[in-house]
């Protein structure tokens, strides 16, 4: 086994366990990549980026008042969708789980590519969807998914990369996160 170094769990929502598991997977991927074709420079860049995560998390936490305001706006909603693609699918699943664990509000996480295969039928003006939509290789597909939800009058909360002001035109609310690799 691998010791996570997450420390003792104090609450039900074990976000630090999820975060430490992701960090371990990144380190494992770099180790395996270095044994194959990954260059030393690329491996170093990934490890340095991983070391930046605590500071980047502090930047997001500094937006506490903005996020509390959003929580108040949506507190009466009884259901939420969390949607992500590729590497952000586990983040969407974890986000839905955390909302359920902490607030006892029903939430489901889905791969955004599966939206048309059932979940879209649940979208209406009372069903907010949280999109994990950083500017990455599947960004345009996420924008298309957001537009599908908007066409059904569904409220959209986007988790987007700092500096992505275009997403404001199609999302009701945006929480910005720092740009990473």
Residue ranges of model-derived segments:
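Active-site regions of enzymes building and remodeling cell-envelope glycoconjugates
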Residues: 1-4, 167-180
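Cofactor-binding loop segments of dinucleotide-utilizing enzymes, especially the Rossmann-like FAD-
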Residues: 85, 134, 161
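Short, structured coil segments at secondary-structure junctions
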Residues: 103, 125, 152, 169-171
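Active-site phosphate/pyrophosphate-binding segments
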Residues: 1-128
């Amino acid at each position: 086994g691998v010791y996570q170094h997450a420390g003792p769990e104090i609450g039900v929502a074990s976000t630090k366990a999820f975060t430490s598991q992701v960090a371990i997977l990144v380190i494992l991927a770099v180790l395996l990549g270095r044994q194959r074709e990954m260059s030393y420079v690329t491996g170093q860049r990934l490890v340095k980026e991983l070391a930046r995560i605590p500071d980047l998390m502090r930047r997001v936490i500094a937006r506490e008042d903005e996020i509390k305001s959003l929580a108040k706006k949506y507190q009466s909603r009884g259901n939420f969708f969390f949607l992500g693609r590729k590497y952000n699918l586990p983040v969407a699943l974890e986000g839905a789980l955390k909302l359920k664990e902490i607030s006892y509000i029903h939430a489901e996480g889905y791969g955004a590519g599966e939206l048309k295969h059932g979940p879209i039928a649940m979208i209406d003006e009372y069903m907010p969807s949280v999109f994990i939509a950083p500017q990455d290789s599947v960004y345009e597909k996420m924008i298309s998914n957001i537009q599908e939800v908007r066409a059904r009058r569904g409220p959209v909360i986007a988790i987007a990369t700092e500096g992505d002001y275009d997403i404001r035109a199609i999302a009701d609310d945006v929480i910005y996160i720092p740009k990473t690799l």
